[in-house]
Structures are given as structure tokens and as C-alpha cells.
Amino acid sequence: MEVGIKDQIATNSILEAEGIYFSYDNGYDVFENINIEAGQGKFIAIIGPSGIGKSTLLRILGGFLKPDRGTVRLLGKPLYEPIPEVALIHQSIVTFPWMDAKENVMLSMKTKDMSKDEMVEKAKESLSRVGLDGFEDLYPKEMSGGMRQRVAIARAFAADPYVFLMDEPFAHLDELTAEGLRQDIYNILFSGETPLKSVIMVSHNLTEVLELADEIYILNNIPATVVGKVQVTMARPRNPRSDEFNANLDMLYSYLTPPRKKK
């Protein structure tokens, strides 16, 4: 039965991981021949059982960890270290308590050829884009968790990256705040104003994944491999209460069996 997902993906690659192998220092093999592409203007999700290595993979994609074998490329060029063009938004909310909101955002512009006045203006603009217009002088202790996460996301926006790597970015927020932030991020990134942007997100929340993603990669096994990749073809906006949405959701849950060690 057609439920809106097809096992075929066509991409115009912005970020690409090819033949990634990785093991921890203790010899534990984590990944075996991982291949992932993030196409232009695409929202990519990576799912899999807990402990499979999704966050570790995100760090490899961002240049924070070096694979044992394989290559990560940004716009066709090998990526060997973290660069401003690839922004990582952590699961834990990272803000610096001695800096106000705009100063937190300005940190991502330190490598750019900008005056302080230009950085302040850019920081205010980025905060406004995530719904914090007029809150630029607040310190983290004066903000809710949702506001602090918006500051962290505004900091990533201000760097003008090609790719956003998002590690469970809504995990510690209440559902109402998370829903508003999800929609804000999607609208900002894919409104047509930033056509080169791509997102790769890892999440345990499959409803969230299905609501946002264009393409979904499924990790499983030990060492982890990509056991499936699917394209979501449902029209937007997607209604989590619809029969079509729930049929897709059931299919995704079927992939999340406990990982098995490869023979």
C-alpha cells in the first residue's frame, strides 16, 4: 500500500559522507561503510535504536571527529575539521551565562571580516528570526529553556552556514515550545531566502522526524550501517493526526528493532 514514502532519493549534494568507518579507542567498531548525502534545500533525519551512534555520526559529519576510513565532503571538498560553514546545534543548550543574548550570538561571527557594529546588527537580526526580537540584552539566567535554545540556534544562523547539524535540538523543551520552534526553523531555512541550506538532524522522536524530514536514513546493526533510506512524499503541512501520517509512523517504528551484531 502506498503510504507516502519511497525507497529512492535524488540529491544535489551539499554535504556528503562516503564509506565512513569508525571505532572507539577501546577497539569497539561503531560504523561500517556509512554513506549519507544532504541535498540542497533538504531536511535530512537520521534515526536508529538508542546507543547506535547517531550523535557520534553527527560529530564526524561536522569535522569534530576523524573517521578511521572514508571521507566527508562539503560542496565536493574534503572536510577535515570544524568550520563555520557547518554549524552543530547540540542537544544540551549551550549558552554562556556571562554574555547577553546578542553577545552569545556574536561568538559565531568572530572569524568574519565584520566591525563590532555590524556583528551587533547581525546578532539582533538572527535573534529576531527565531522570535527573540527585543530580547537581545537578556542574560541566560533571565531566559526560559526554550529562549536559550533559540539563542543557540540564532548563533548558528548568524554564521551563515551551508549545513545545520542538529543533535536532538528539541529534546529538553516542552512540546508546545518545541512545536513552535520546529516550525520557525523550517520556515526560516526553507522559505526560499536561503536555497543552499541543508539540515541533518538526529532524533528519537519519530513524530518530529516525520513532520520535518524530506529524507530519512535508518541506522542499525553492530557495527552500525545504513539499513534503509526513504523519501517522505507527504504534502506539507503534515498533520500528525491523519491516517497517512500514522501509516508512515508505523513503518518507521518497524525499523527500530534492537541492533544485532553482524556475523
Place the predicted regions along the sequence by residue:
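Conserved ABC ATPase "signature" region
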Residues: 106, 117-135, 184-190
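Conserved ABC ATPase signature
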Residues: 139-143, 147
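A short, proline-enriched helix->beta-strand linker immediately N-terminal to the Walker B motif
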Residues: 158-162
